[in-house]
């Protein structure tokens, strides 16, 4: 599925030699991704309470946007240098909250050999059959182990819910849960029936695209991967099944995207 030519516009973000996440080409020289892919931070040790479970973790502090001369976008195996980084201002206003997690990257050179994604500004995404594409970790749904191969993967799901904060009077998130074919109690929102290639986004998928096929071979981009809302108690019971992933919706950001790159 990921090897379909329609998804050649999904690539990788590199901070020098460090793989940071996924991205989607939306014009000859602009790429959309998740803002957190271009943020550097220092860290300190702290405790985190996740649904009553206490963890020790490296908590990021002193956030800053990566300089453009350290950023590269890899498409079809070729790395392209970044000229300009445009992070959504509401993300920068409170990076710790992580809302409005979207960034535009202007490339130094035009990309002619890859068709950019078609952006969808429609607001009828609920219950849509969708395909997520990115370079995230892979694994088996009922096993804890995952591997980071940095290979393009794709999976299917359904937009189960729309919510979150608002931009231009539109909620900014699309939600999909990871349904099990054998245990409907893992269903959190929407239909309990999984798609044939039902999947959950993972580390590395951030910034990748959520696509909807509107006619045979004609895909449109409706979301950018933000990540999943990890529920530790659910993980203890059903591993990856029952987790919920979030995608930053394209529609609310039409004005911002158009103003900055179109």
Where are the regions that the model predicts?
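A conserved glycine-rich beta-strand in the N-terminal activation segment of trypsin-fold
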Residues: 10-28, 96-97
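Chymotrypsin/trypsin-fold serine protease catalytic domain
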Residues: 99-102, 108-198
């Amino acid at each position: 599925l990921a090897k379909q030519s329609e998804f050649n516009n999904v690539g990788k973000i590199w901070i020098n030699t460090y793989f940071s996440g996924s991205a989607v080409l939306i014009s000859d020289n602009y790429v959309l991704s998740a803002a957190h892919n271009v943020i550097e931070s220092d860290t300190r040790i702290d405790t985190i309470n996740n649904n009553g479970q206490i963890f020790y973790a490296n908590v990021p502090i002193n956030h800053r946007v990566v300089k453009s001369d350290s950023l590269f976008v890899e498409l079809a195996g070729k790395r392209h240098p970044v000229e300009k980084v445009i992070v959504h201002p509401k993300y920068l206003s409170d990076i710790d909250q992580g809302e409005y997690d979207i960034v535009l990257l202007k490339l130094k050179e035009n990309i002619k050999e890859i068709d950019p994604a078609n952006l969808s500004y429609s607001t009828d995404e609920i219950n849509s059959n969708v395909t997520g594409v990115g370079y995230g970790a892979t694994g088996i749904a009922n096993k804890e182990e995952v591997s980071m191969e940095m290979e393009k993967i794709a999976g299917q799901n359904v937009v189960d819910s729309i919510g979150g904060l608002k931009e231009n009077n539109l909620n900014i998130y699309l939600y999909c849960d990871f349904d099990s074919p054998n245990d409907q109690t893992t269903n959190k929102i929407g239909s309990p029936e999984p798609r044939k290639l039902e999947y959950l986004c993972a580390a590395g998928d951030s910034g990748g695209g959520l696509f909807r096929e509107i006619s045979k071979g004609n895909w449109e981009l409706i979301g950018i991967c933000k990540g999943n809302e990890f529920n530790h108690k659910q993980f203890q019971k059903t591993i990856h099944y029952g987790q919920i992933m979030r995608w930053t919706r394209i529609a609310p950001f039409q004005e911002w995207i158009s103003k900055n790159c179109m």
